[in-house]
From Swiss-Prot:
It comes from Haloarcula marismortui (strain ATCC 43049 / DSM 3752 / JCM 8966 / VKM B-1809). The lineage of its organism: Archaea, Methanobacteriati, Methanobacteriota, Stenosarchaea group, Halobacteria. The gene is top6B. This is Type 2 DNA topoisomerase 6 subunit B. Belongs to the TOP6B family. It is an enzyme of class 5 (isomerase). GO terms for molecular function: ATP binding; DNA binding; DNA topoisomerase type II (double strand cut, ATP-hydrolyzing) activity. It catalyses: ATP-dependent breakage, passage and rejoining of double-stranded DNA. SMART domains: HATPase_c (SM00387). InterPro entries: HATPase_C_sf, Ribosomal_Su5_D2-typ_SF, Ribsml_uS5_D2-typ_fold_subgr, Top6b_C, TopoVI_B, TopoVI_B_transducer.
């Protein structure tokens, strides 16, 4: 069959024709044809995405300027289109910057910043402008008044998709009632089918940004929805930009950093360009790099003094024309220094010889030149490495199983010794050493019918590599590493292997457990709230913090599954719920252990609850450009699970206690029915006065009993603790006449009533008495706090 390429080849100049048809495209033109990648894949979702991008911009602008956000969002019907209006009270945007911020994709100030941000790429709001102009043909209308200026600037613009530059049709000044801030108005093809999602997004934004006030209006509302900021809420802590962490860079990034740095040495480069790298850490990186670049020198046990391979005699024989006494002293010094070590490598022998030579030169007129020293090194090293088989046998035998017979171990050791004869210095990398072991093991299996599996080979490798000594060579200059991709790759591997402190967390601004709970309280009417904030962890060199919150009961919907709220860097994630790591973690938890209904033992639990999870990071691993879901990163999933479980344990305690109180209440109700009947029967039988059952009920139920006794002008309030734990009681006795307090209570007068406040701690089985006097007739009303209603009996 004739190929397309052969058909092309039949014509002359076809390559030139094809070349003429090829051209570069701008990023704006690319996204013009791929709107779905940014979250504009349907009319319903497009409106939600546009609101999200505009609100994110508003929140970021306010927080960066230190202004508590006040944001207004309005959606209007405008003929065949919908009009979106978003206003904020931020610092405003300068005349020069506003067109680029709204009309140029990939224009932003935070792309290179390693700190927590809602957005970084500079795509979001300009993508909304692009979608608006593509679907309605109308420009974006922007009004911005920088703080301190008398007038606002008004623009109408579109994105020129050929050049990715703003095309401004209107540029004028105008008046605006806001003292500072920004307003954007977009018309677009959209629909309100995602109305509930849109409202959820606004509410979720209010939950996770309790410091913000948000007002939302849409068609069909009688009045706008207002989400007030939480009391005591303050702006999030300012974040600090950090340098990259050595564990978080890729090879291409490292090469760029090597080319751009002003440092000449690897040590200086590591300390200047990376966070958490000081002198000692840089030395560790260099040591690991040298292992890869130069290799390690195998270190062998020195021969015993009386063995044939006598180091002292070998060095004496190698040194000529230095005088017998000087030579003997020099040789003895070399031999003693080598024998002082358990193992010695070639480069260490070089150092020993140099040191002994310098001492000999200092003691006399003899000079030990380079040739003499080299001869001495070779002689000493040959004596050290004369019989490697026995040394290797001991190393191999120590890490292989007892099932390996001596012949097999000896065979492997002998063949390894032969491999080292090929390199006089016995210097090699870990991979080269692995190759030695594999070839020697293969030959041993083939010739000696012995088996050395992967585990045995790995154990031998580890033993020999541990016995080897790192070389003390200066690493190449930074410029040389930048020019050699393989060397740069060795440096990257060394960085990743080195144990380095996790990056600092001042680049992050978590919400805090207190404000997570406050946000939930503000938006959900529930009976129980709990929240947790984990310590910082690291993924790929980027720090992250996970926070979780749970609300339960109250007015929350009891039918169906619980509501799972997902957030990343204070932004709600409203789409791709099923593709998100947060959802996967929630499904994987056995919620029955926390007293929530979970049919089948897996999946989203059922019940009146809200589970929220917030991930704060300098680099959230989203699954796509639209930032709808968090990727399944094991380190992040682990922290999400731990944060949820921390809050869920509080929920379990609450539900257990509630169940216990319910059972106690049911028991108490039954006793309250039975005891009066028993008391009545006893009264009839004994002809005694009617029995008071409140005291008896309190003692049977182990309750805290509060009783009042009034005798003449004296009032006694008695607290009897029938429980087996201390009771911290907050008692307020409201009296209509002025009391005279005698035992430490405080009195506050208000509107002709006196509030006697008493806060005793009553031990288990003990009684405390508040006594005071009133000179006039009075009425009394007692209020008790600090004790659960089910554990309290009041007869006062």
């Amino acid at each position: 069959m004739t190929s397309y390429q052969s058909q092309l080849g039949e014509g002359e100049g076809i390559a030139e024709e094809l070349a003429e048809s090829q051209r570069a495209i701008s990023i704006a033109e690319f996204f013009e044809k791929n709107k779905h990648m940014l979250g504009f894949d349907s009319e319903a979702r497009a409106l939600v995405t546009a609101v999200k991008e505009a609100v994110d911009n508003a929140l970021d602008a306010c927080e960066e300027a230190g202004i508590l956000p006040d944001i207004y969002v309005e959606i209007q019907e405008s003929g065949d289109y919908y009009k979106l209006v978003v206003e904020d009270n931020g610092p405003g945007i300068t005349k020069e910057q506003a067109p680029k911020i709204f009309g140029k994709l990939l224009y932003g100030s935070r792309f290179h910043a390693r700190e927590q941000n809602r957005g970084q790429q500079g795509i979001g709001i300009s993508a909304a402008v692009l979608y608006s102009q593509l679907t309605s043909g109308k420009p974006a209308k922007i009004t911005s008044r920088p703080k301190g200026q008398d007038e606002a600037q008004y623009f109408e613009l579109i994105v020129d998709t050929d050049t990715n530059e703003p095309e401004i049709s209107v540029d004028e000044t105008t008046t605006w009632e806001r003292p500072h801030g920004t307003r954007i108005e977009l018309e677009m093809e959209a629909n309100m089918r995602a109305r509930s999602t849109l409202r959820d997004y606004i509410q979720d934004t209010a939950v996770v940004n309790p410091h913000a006030r948000v007002e939302f209006d849409e068609p069909g509302l009688d009045e706008s929805l207002k989400f007030e900021r939480a009391e005591r809420a303050e702006l999030p802590d300012e974040t600090e930009e950090i340098r990259p962490h050595p564990h978080g860079v890729e090879l291409g990034t490292l090469l760029k950093m090597l080319e751009a740095t002003d440092s000449y040495s690897v040590s200086g480069f590591m300390q200047e360009e990376f966070t958490r790298v000081g002198g000692k850490t840089a030395d560790s990186v260099i040591a690991n790099f040298n292992d890869r670049h130069y290799g390690r020198g195998m270190a062998w046990q020195p021969p015993k003094v009386n063995e044939d391979a006598d180091i002292e005699r070998a060095v004496e024989d190698a040194v000529a024309n230095k005088g017998a006494e000087t030579t003997a002293t020099f040789a003895a010094a070399v031999s003693d220094a080598i024998h002082d070590r358990d193992r010695v490598a070639y480069h260490e022998v070089e150092s020993i010889v140099d040191s002994a030579a310098e001492d000999a030169e200092a003691d006399g007129d003899t000079t030990f030149g380079a040739t003499v020293r080299e001869n001495a090194v070779d002689a000493a090293w040959n004596a050290v490495s004369d019989n490697l088989s026995s040394d290797l046998y001991a190393l191999v035998d120590d890490v292989t199983t007892k099932r390996k017979d001596d012949a097999a171990v000896e065979g492997l050791a002998s063949r390894l010794a032969d491999k080292f004869d090929d390199d006089g210095r016995h210097r090699l990398t870990r991979d080269e050493l692995r190759g030695y072991i594999d070839r020697a093991a293969d030959m041993t299996e083939e010739q000696d019918d012995a088996t050395f599996g992967e585990t045995a080979r790995e154990n031998v490798l580890e033993a020999l590599w541990t016995a080897a000594e790192g070389v003390r060579e200066e690493p190449p200059k930074v410029s040389d590493i930048a020019d050699d991709r393989d060397t740069a790759s060795q440096l990257l591997s060394a960085m990743r292997e080195t144990d380095i402190i996790a990056p600092p967390t001042d680049c992050l601004s978590p919400i805090s457990a207190e404000l997570v709970e406050e946000g939930l309280r503000k938006e959900f009417d529930a009976d129980f709230y709990a929240a947790s904030t984990r310590d910082a962890s690291v993924h790929g060199g980027d720090p992250f913090i996970v926070e979780a919150g749970i609300a339960y009961g109250g007015e929350l919907e009891s039918e169906g599954t619980v509501d799972v709220m997902r957030f990343a860097n204070r932004v709600p994630l409203v789409y791709q719920r099923g593709a998100c790591a947060t959802t996967d973690v929630v499904k994987s938890i056995r919620w029955r252990n926390y007293n929530l209904d979970q049919p089948g033992g897996s999946g989203i639990p059922k019940g009146p609850a809200v589970i929220m999870v917030h991930v704060a990071s300098t680099n959230v691993p989203f699954t796509s450009e639209s930032k709808d879901a968090i990727a399944n990163v094991p380190e992040m999933e682990d922290e999400i699970e731990l944060a949820i479980r921390e809050a869920a344990r509080e929920l379990k305690s609450y539900l257990n206690k509630r169940r216990s109180m319910q059972q106690r209440r049911e028991k108490q109700d039954k006793l309250a029915t039975i005891l009066p009947e028993m008391a009545e029967k006893l009264t009839e039988v004994t002809d005694n006065d009617e029995l008071h059952i409140d005291d008896s009920l309190a003692r049977i139920m182990n309750n805290v009993l509060v009783e009042r006794e009034v005798e003449d002008d004296t009032v006694r309030v008695r607290i009897e603790n029938n429980d087996d734990t201390n009771a911290d009681v907050e008692l307020t006795d409201i009296v209509t006449a002025e009391p005279q307090v005698t035992n430490g209570a405080t009195v506050v007068e208000m509107d002709g009533e006196w509030f006697v406040k008493w806060s005793p701690t009553v031990g288990a089985g003990e009684t405390a008495v508040l006594e005071y006097s009133v000179t006039d007739e009075a009425e009394f009303t007692v209020s008790v706090d600090g004790i659960e209603e089910e554990k309290l009996t009041v007869n006062a």
